[in-house]
UniProtKB/Swiss-Prot annotation:
Gene3D superfamilies: Glucose-6-phosphate isomerase like protein, domain 1, Helix hairpin bin. Keywords: Ribonucleoprotein, Ribosomal protein. This is Small ribosomal subunit protein uS2. One of its GO terms (cellular component) is cytosolic small ribosomal subunit. It holds the Pfam family Ribosomal_S2. The keyword Disulfide bond does not apply. GO terms for biological process: translation. Belongs to the universal ribosomal protein uS2 family.
């Protein structure tokens, strides 16, 4: 599987070049701005193309070495494409409110994930006999809340090797936690962003739904390319969803074994 390709035309059609209003900008993005039109900054896609390519290469290589990737996008227009992309390539995501400490306090988050798994297992097995209707309803609500917050990372099994971020301003806490832990940040950088927030950043619109979907799909394809490299010769068909799911399951099992060994 080849590294996902994209064209300047695709970027233009998705509106990647449109930035924010000129009064809403970060001066550090000046080198990546081509000009302005009707009070809107226009980004220079000649910078976007190589930077996006470099970001895709990094993600592919990270996965090929066995690393996990966490997609982060909690703004309304990013929620669905972020979840769909992560699920398609057997990776992980957070697309609702970022919980402070998700990365920097992973042990506590792991306990909440364990509780989510236990509740899922209980309801799937028809358990809960002996509980009152109110108790069952309370547990259902607890499970739903945990699923919404942590469902996308329930099988991650440990810290990611990289995070892919849509809107570094919106996801400032996630970016801060990743940088504190030395986890590389891959991110789209709109004209109101600080380019120093990303280790692998590329100039682009972080609000348009078409642009966000394009980024997410490209990174999902890069992950699949990395998985193909890491499983070369193992007889795994990445075209089969069951095989992709099995890779994720194996990743979680390995992480659990590593954690047990460290205990």
């Amino acid at each position: 599987m080849a590294l996902p390709d994209f064209s300047m035309r695709q970027l233009l059609e998705a509106g990647v070049h449109f930035g924010h209003q000129t009064h809403r900008w970060n001066p550090r993005m000046k080198p990546y701005i081509y000009g302005e039109r009707s009070g809107i900054h226009i980004m220079d896609l000649s910078h976007t193309v190589p930077a996006l390519h470099q970001s895709l290469v990094f993600v592919r290589d990270t996965v090929a070495k066995g690393g996990r990737v966490l997609f982060v996008g909690t703004k309304r227009q990013a929620q669905e494409p972020v979840a769909e992309a992560a699920q398609r390539c057997a990776q992980y995501y957070m697309n609702h409110r970022w919980l402070g400490g998700t990365l920097t306090n992973w042990s506590t988050v792991s306990n909440s994930i364990k509780q989510l798994r236990e509740l899922n297992a209980m309801f799937e097995s028809g358990g809960g006999s002996g509980l009152t209707k109110k108790e069952l309803l309370d547990l259902q609500r607890r499970r739903d809340k945990l699923q919404k917050s942590l469902g996308g990372i329930a099988d991650m099994g440990g810290l990611p090797a990289a995070i892919v971020v849509i809107d570094t301003n919106k996801e400032a806490i996630a970016v801060q936690e990743a940088r504190k832990l030395g986890i590389p940040v891959v991110a789209v950088l709109d004209t109101n962003c600080n380019p120093s927030d990303a280790d692998f950043g590329f100039p682009g619109n972080d609000d348009a739904a078409r642009a966000i979907s394009l980024y997410c799909n490209l990174f999902a394809d890069a992950v699949l390319d990395g998985l193909a490299e890491s499983t070369a010769g193992l007889g795994v068909d990445l075209g089969a969803s069951a095989d992709i799911a099995s890779l994720a399951d194996a990743d979680v099992k390995l992480a659990d074994e590593e954690a047990a060994g460290e205990a």
